[in-house]
Amino acid sequence: MRPVATRRSKAIGRARISRGIAPLALAAALPLALGAQSTDTLLSALKLPSRAGFAPLVPPPPGRPVLLRPDRVFDATSEETHTGWAVLVEGDSIAAVGPAAAVRAPSDAETIALPGLTLLPGLIDAHSHLFLHPYNETVWNDQVLKEPEGYRMVEAVLHARNTLMQGFTTLRDLGTEGAGFADVAIKRAIDEGLIPGPRLAVATRAIVATSSYGPGPRGFRPDLELPQGGQAVSGIPQVLAAVREQAGRGADWIKVYADYGRGPGGEAVPTFSQDELDALVSEAHSAGRPVSAHATTPEGMRRAILAGVNTIEHGFGGTDSLFHTMAVHGIAYLPTLTAVEAYAEYFDHYVPGKNEPTASMREAAHALELAMKNGVTIGCGSDVGVFTHGTNARELEWLVRDGMRPAQALLAATAVDARIMRMDKEIGRIVRGLKADLVAVGGDPTKDISVVAHVRFVMKNGVIYRAP
């Protein structure tokens, strides 16, 4: 999603680059963006910190077996936690899990004690934008119009690394917002071990109706050819061509904007006809790609649901009957509550803990309430990029504030998201045979969801990226 804000200051820009261990991730990104031949040479030339204590630039292959001994395990097969359990990791997979006395580790296993911590499956955010950064730093239009793609690629590398280090080991990235197919390159770089980051499912450009998204054309000279935040199409032939191009270039998901702010006063209205949406979904499904629909209005949601999309993003205008239909047809819902809070902070002077929730925040909370009432599958998708990467855990806190039990929110960000993303045979639970994506947080998040922000241990594919 896109709106308005103020140009960030140079001081803010410097803070974003220098914070934490971002410089190391920047060094990892520069060979990709600038053509440097040796990352190690670049590290030396820039006099960056040694690798000790940081996510490896090139993750090593998993070493000897690792036995993890936390205080408790939330395995995401239910809402229960298990005290006194242990988890054995061999290679990139979970080899055993259960009561510590029953988990027998090989003699050469490394034992890692995690006292006071709860071990969770790696967290998942099913609605992210790695190529965006908060709109109170740079307006969306300026990000698309003024930031070169190479610059945005470097930023995305930083965002990916920061996200992983905060326990989110998987993202569904729903559109590069003007950076073309660069998400496919980031995904490849992560998969091949060139840079640290979450495993990605990508949607490339997102499909939008002609003159409905932006930048412009309203407010700009009509003779200007403006870069676009999505792939603009009109009519069934162009819709089909866009789906085929995106699938061919590496999209795992097809994202469509079923409505957007193209009304006379800038209000959200439907952007595609029913026939166009039907054709888009049919072609995507024929290509084996599920479809994500941005939809905030009742009519936009209705058309997307009738077309058979797989997920609805935002859904703030959803009605009781629409959510009932979603439940009947197995269409999942990603509420993106944190983005609503961020918009309120940027544009409505909302101050967390001081002001009453805005009308938009109340509308989003009501939509979640209706979705829960109707038994809709609800995942955790935050729209991060609208707000700061690495703070994705805010979405779990909002899910709880707006009605979920803490354990429900944990399931949404693990097993449920994995199922929505069709990756539940690989990730999302702490079960023998699944990938060793594991995160440990201080305290018990089934009692206090806020502790998911206090990440102490991160493992992805059996590789430790963060240790106490």
Ranges and model annotations:
Residues 54-58, 73-86, 99-100, 405-410, ...:
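Acidic, glycine-enriched loop/beta-strand segments at the rims
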Residues 117-194, 210, 275, 299, ...:
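Metal-associated gating/positioning segment near the N- to mid-region
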Residues 131-152, 210-227, 263-270, 328-361:
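Active-site gating loops and adjacent loop-to-helix segments of metal-dependent hydrolytic enzymes
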Residues 134-136, 183, 212-213, 264-265, ...:
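Histidine/acidic-residue-rich catalytic or RNA/ligand-binding cores of hydrolases
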Residues 142-144, 286, 290, 360-445:
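His/Asp/Glu-enriched, well-ordered alpha-helical/loop segment
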Residues 155-182, 197-206, 251-262, 290, ...:
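Divalent metal-dependent hydrolysis catalytic cores, especially in the metallo-beta-lactamase
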Residues 185, 238-332, 359-377:
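Histidine/acidic residue-rich metal-binding segments in metalloenzymes
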